[in-house]
Amino acid sequence: MNTEQVREEVRSWLAAHWDPNLDLIEWRELLTDSGWGAPDWPSDYFGRDLAPQLSSVVDEELARIGAIGAAHSGVRMLAAVTLLAHGNHEQKQNYLRPILTGEHAWCQLFSEPGSGSDLAGATTRADLDGDEWIINGQKVWNTSAHHADYGLLLARSDWDEPKHKGLSYFILDMHQPGVEVRQLKQMNGHASFNEVFFTDARVPRANILGAPGDGWQIAMTTLAYERRSFDRPRNPAGKSPSSAPIYQQYQQELEVANEPYKWYPQRAGRVDLVLQRAKETGAINDPVIRQDIARLHILAQSARWTAQRARAAQKAGKPQGPEGSLGKLAASHIGRLASRVHTDISANEALLTGPDSAMEGVIAEVLVSTPAGSIAGGTDEIQRNIIAERVLGLPKEPRFDTGPFRDVPRNSSPKDQ
């Protein structure tokens, strides 16, 4: 199908089915079952086999009449992409539809207190007991785990294999005994993350993705998508009678989905506020400050163009290259530079919070939020290693952990052995 054929068909379907008086889940069930909720997915799994670049036409038509799309935001899509790539038929049938309708929320259960950057060093245990896997251990930095119905769990199922080969990937029910979720308070005042404890939690044998030991390769699929730019949840455009119940339900969903990310603009350094703040304080008259602002805006615009090229390549169906690592490195560098420029402009006032502080405390929040950019989602050092080894072809770092994982030196707990 070409662009105009897609536009005509989806427009005709929406004219016959869109009704703002429907319940949100009821509407999304119609949309999902029609294939228009995820048109670039396989037709066997709630899609229409459209080329990725044609899915934007569907988005445009939904927005034109104010129709709400499928639930595409956040970790839901990490789960969907991973299931599409590695799930069996039964898993896809059971879990993909409730992702698109918004009935199920998901979280990612990868990082651990003792293995953040070294993800393959995970020590959360998965022991097979009949038709169930018994899970014991701890995860951390889990966005939205306190709202999640299911988790994407990476756990160690074989201690006699090297660390990358002894991992398995599970779908874990978060609403069961043995799963405890605790929110973490950050130094910027937000609580975007959680720590999750497992005490004899259970996963049915049918809920392993791939085979035992395939966890590392499957996790790479999840992480490759995570490092790309997510499509943000779209507010209905055009004809949007906010009094209709469906829009109120959608707004409530957005508030829950976006709550962990409210501080993300500050994490990125708030480049958009630098010039305004320089004018307010008179620092714009300082030639050094002006030069720093110019450099900052040049870097930020270059990063935006790089991200646009990466998104265009993704929509054209090209494989993921080094753009994810390059973009993440650029973002953390820009955030640090913006934080320094804000400090130079506002001086001691940059440290103050409250209504009388610089931009009502936003600048202070920038200073305590930007360090996260160089850590979350893979540290700057990891991104540099990826670029060095996979793009530049430089020698890999020497490794001393290629034997059985139980023999690898580490800070172990009594349950590790």
Feature-to-residue mapping (PLM):
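Glycine-rich phosphate/cofactor-binding loops in nucleotide/flavin-utilizing enzymes
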Residues: Q53, V57-V58, L78, W216-T221, ...
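Amphipathic, small/basic residue-rich leader segments at the start of a protein or domain
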Residues: M1-G74, Q93-P98, Y261, E280, ...
